[in-house]
Regions:
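Extracytoplasmic mature domains of secreted/periplasmic and thylakoid-lumen proteins
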Residues: 127-190
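A post-motif C-terminal structural segment
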Residues: 55-57, 66-72, 76-120, 169-436
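Structural beta-sheet core signal
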Residues: 60-61, 161, 338
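N-terminal secretory signal peptides
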Residues: 1-10, 14-26, 32
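A glycine- and small-residue-enriched flexible loop/hinge segment at structural boundaries
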Residues: 110, 114-138
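Alpha/propeptide regions of enzymes that mature by internal proteolysis
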Residues: 47-48, 62, 68, 72, ...
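C-terminal segment of N-terminal export signals and the immediately downstream linker at the start
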Residues: 26-56
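Active-site-adjacent structural elements in enzyme catalytic domains
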Residues: 53-70, 75, 139-154
Length: 436
């Protein structure tokens, strides 16, 4: 497919598409852009943004699965916790951006799309089928060129792709790969190496060894001229001029992705650190494009883990702040877009069973994600046939939920389980031990 020349109109259209994406109906959009003096004056007069300078530095942040409820739950949680339980809404780094909106996110065949098709829409402006990455939905043999590829080839921009999940996962892959199915993980990794993009950072390749007959994805990248860095110390030591770089996070959690923000150890690099390193490595006179995905918001919501979702949204806010800091140093040359590819889980903030209350401060008692609890404790319970009461002692430690028979029951407050809840938990636990 021939490269279409980037005009000012098409670039801004691509920017609008990049801000437009969510799983059931709409996703939030926020943008912070370079303005000319004329547009600033127009803004002041009539509230409209009429004229942009062409952005030299473009940041695109995608909260995978991050609908309005995910954003608001993080704002409410932070506001409540920071104000001793008072009903207070906190600002995030991107919630006060001057341009805000929402968009529908259906793909070519479904109102409930996945990350492959929605990320394709963001990256190329084309709709396709769920599961397909940057290929036409009818024959799956016509590739779509991505905005990252256009900027890299036609404008000489350096390009960075960052994700808290696997670097070959659907969303990051949609900026450099073209595959009939998102499950072609090894082939996606090969396309990463062939992209020539200057900076990649995230979790491990999902099928790093392919079918075992060829070089692993690390070797493929190294053979293509990439510095393949797998330690945090090695990443920290990188400086401008390091050349093409692929960083695989040293500390990996479930699914060989980066750890949830709430599970990260003290000093462990999180999304913000990789954004800052990306800025350091990509910054140049021609410009750069950086796509950053907070991918485990989606994973948390698939697991109905509200606390993990909240903490990953807050960490994404920190990462966006790093871009805002860069914007403040380059206000007339920088565009920041913050959006989602789709919403996940149909999150609601309060409902009938909670009497439309939220109990957000209860989440402060959760000390680890559901996924980490499962891998750290539940697998051992299954192997050892741990008694229910012993397992619930760990639940109390890491989530605060307390049995009525516990010595601390009188002081457990709203975290005291009812007999009905205990019966349901016991049944579910026994079923877990039975089926593994």
């Amino acid at each position: 497919m021939k490269n279409a020349k980037i005009s000012r109109r098409s670039f801004l259209k691509a920017g609008a598409v990049a801000s437009a994406v969510g799983m059931l109906s709409a996703a939030p959009v926020a943008a912070h852009a370079a303005e000319t003096d004329a547009s600033a004056a127009a803004d002041e007069e009539n509230g409209l943004l009429d004229v942009f300078k062409k952005p030299k530095y473009v940041f695109l942040f995608i909260g995978d699965g991050m609908g309005t409820a995910q954003i608001q739950s993080a704002r409410f949680y932070k506001g409540t916790v920071d104000n001793n339980g008072a009903v207070t809404e906190a600002d995030l780094s991107f919630t006060s951006f001057p341009q805000v909106g929402s968009v529908t996110t259906y793909d070519s065949t479904s109102f409930c799309p996945d990350s492959a098709s929605t990320a394709t829409s963001i990256a190329t402006g084309h709709k396709t089928e769920s599961g397909v990455i940057n290929m036409c939905p009818w024959t799956r043999d016509v590739p779509y060129e991505t905005i990252a590829e256009k900027l890299h080839a036609q404008k000489g921009y350096k390009v960075g792709v960052i994700s808290t999940v696997n670097i070959d996962h659907a969303t990051p892959a949609a900026f450099y790969a073209h595959q009939k199915t998102r499950k072609n993980y090894y082939e996606i990794g090969v396309e990463l190496a062939n992209s020539g993009f200057e900076y990649f950072a995230g979790g491990e390749f999902q099928k790093v060894n392919g079918d075992g007959t060829g070089p692993d994805n690390h070797t493929v990248a190294a053979n293509a001229g990439y510095n393949v860095v797998t330690t945090q110390a090695g990443a920290a030591a990188l400086t401008a001029g390091a050349g093409k770089t692929l960083i695989i996070a040293e500390n990996l959690g479930d699914g060989k992705a980066m750890n949830y923000a709430m599970d990260a150890a003290n000093g462990e690099w999180q999304l913000t650190d990789y954004v800052k390193k990306g800025i350091e490595l990509l910054n140049n006179k021609k410009g750069f494009f950086m796509m950053t995905e907070s991918g485990k918001i989606d994973w948390a919501c698939h697991a109905n883990d509200a606390a993990a979702s909240i903490h990953d949204v807050l960490e994404m806010s920190n990462a966006v702040q790093a871009a805002v800091d860069f914007y403040n140093a380059h206000p007339n040359e920088t565009l920041i877009l913050v959006t989602a590819d789709h919403e996940t889980g149909g999150m609601a903030i309060g409902y009938k069973t909670t009497n439309y209350d939220t109990f957000l401060t209860n989440l402060t008692h959760q000390k680890m994600s559901y996924a980490k609890f499962d891998s750290t404790y539940v697998q051992g319970y299954i192997a050892n046939k741990t008694p229910f009461e012993a397992a619930m002692a760990d639940v109390k430690t890491h989530f605060g939920l307390t049995l009525p028979t516990d010595p601390d029951a009188a002081s457990a407050g709203k975290l005291l389980l009812t007999d009905y809840e205990v019966a349901n938990l016991r049944t579910a636990y026994e079923r877990t031990l039975e089926v593994g």
